[in-house]
Amino acid sequence: MLKIKFVGAIEGVSGSCTWLHHTDSDTQFLVDCGMHQGTEREEWANSQAFPFQAARLKYVLLTHAHIDHCGMLPRLVREGFTGLVYATRATRELTELMLLDAARVSGMFTEQEVKQIRWSVLDDDLGFKWGRSIRLAEGVWMAYLRSSHILGACLISIGWKVHDGNRSICFSGDVGCQTDENAYLPLMKSGQHPFPDTDYIVVESTYGSRIRAQEHQDSQLRLARLAEVIAHTLFVKGGKVLMPAFSLHRAQELLMDVLHWMKVSLPAIRQAPEHRGSDRLITANVHAPLGHAVTQVYAKHLCSISPNGKFKYLNAELCESLTMQADEIQAMLQRLVEHGRFNAGEGGYLSMTKPKQPSNFEADIVIASAGMCGNGPVVSYLERWGSNPRNTVILTGYQSAGSKGAELMQRATASPALMDSLSPDLAEVVDMSPYYSAHADQQMLLGFLFRTDGFGCNKPATILINHGNPASKYELRKAVQMRADSRKENDRQIKEVRIADARWINLDSGEVIEQSPIEQALLNELEALRRRL
């Protein structure tokens, strides 16, 4: 029997961790082991005892490098885990960077505990390909498929033998936005889908209740809006542009979009007589200490090639957009990391501030961490530029309640305003975050669940929804049921849609494993205590 218990991301969007136990081989393992983030109540969960014995786990299968999916790995090691963490090479390198940074910032674990993690890197094998089966134990195997969420991200399929054949379950990880039809964000190629004969699909629901506007899924409109805001700030108002950014993935996306502005938009802008001073050299700087190291990983792996000769991760449309070959993009990123400067042509140049170097207030455009504006280099730029209406802050990511970024978001507009309508002692704020979200919306999640890529074998699948707030989960469940009832041609058939909870499930039969009265009473007491705290 293979049984499953959801440990984290049951009530919210962080702390992803799922415990599986194959009883026939007595093999216990996890899919992800993430840190809870957000409110004090949510972060309180990080100090609570694991429901499993870390020393008895043989593996952790890691979907990607975000802290809410990998952040408790060092604690797992501290408590006796000596097994292997499976991941792609890019995910391993990014995870190590994220955990070392978290060790320095949070103090929840040590750098030594991060370095003690034992890795098994899937794509170091010369025979690696997406979807290839890898044995975990007698009668249990897994396969990794590509996600478009961030570099190295994957969905994971786990298969096992039962008395009448085989069963399988797929874990979505975080579902990205890129599809075969519309890979509109700059870096990642489209993600793959669960196998057509999958029996169970565990799917995230971060934006399960949200439908993104078509405008925000259009790369040309995103680039045009960014060009409008930058040109208005630099050449009409005569100010500076500040773009707060998360160090992992968002900073690298913005770097590509700013490079596009320099290479493609700026030459056209210079033909317009109303843009005074547009013939001067423009400088754009990336100032993110962790982002500097992350960019080095992107330089190594973004343009890597699979054994079939195709890009493993790179969105090929980026080459066309920038009029650069993949090796030129790779060389540009490497040059920024090593030498701190890249000539973007006649328009100007990109630069990257190395860790511990001072802020570059001379730059015209600055991409700075942290994304929510509460710490990091962005703080010094806000202090210097935040009181001048000639300057513009472009928000490109989620801002949690109570953060400095959320405060800025309260007065943000969707497009630049006339100078005389702005506050005389505050920088203008423009919200472009809907254009950059790396999470699939409801329609994309439905596509992820129902698409079978034309393959005929299509078992009815049970959907298990987690990693979302209650409203998102219930709205997604309703949408999945409605789509299933419509019986579209070539859609995956759906057997049942459930909201994931903390009870054990026998995946051989699909039945919930009921607790004994004593166990259930103890669980009820713990839940009541947790809610009071």
What annotation goes with each model-predicted range?
Residues M1-L61, H66, C70, R75-V236, ...:
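His/Asp/Glu-rich metal-coordinating catalytic cores
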Residues K58, D199, D364, N391, ...:
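Conserved acidic residues
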Residues V140-Y144, V297-S306, M444-F448, D508-A521:
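Short, surface-exposed amphipathic charged segments that create phosphate/polyanion-binding patches used
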Residues L226-G239, P244-E407, A412, P416-M419, ...:
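Hard-cation-handling environments
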Residues L408, P416-L449:
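Generic long, charged, amphipathic alpha-helical segments
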Residues L445, T452-K459, L476:
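C-terminal accessory regions
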Residues D485-L507:
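Conserved phosphate-binding/catalytic loops in two-lobed NTP-binding clefts
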Residues E519-L533:
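Heptad-repeat coiled-coil amphipathic alpha-helices that mediate oligomerization/assembly
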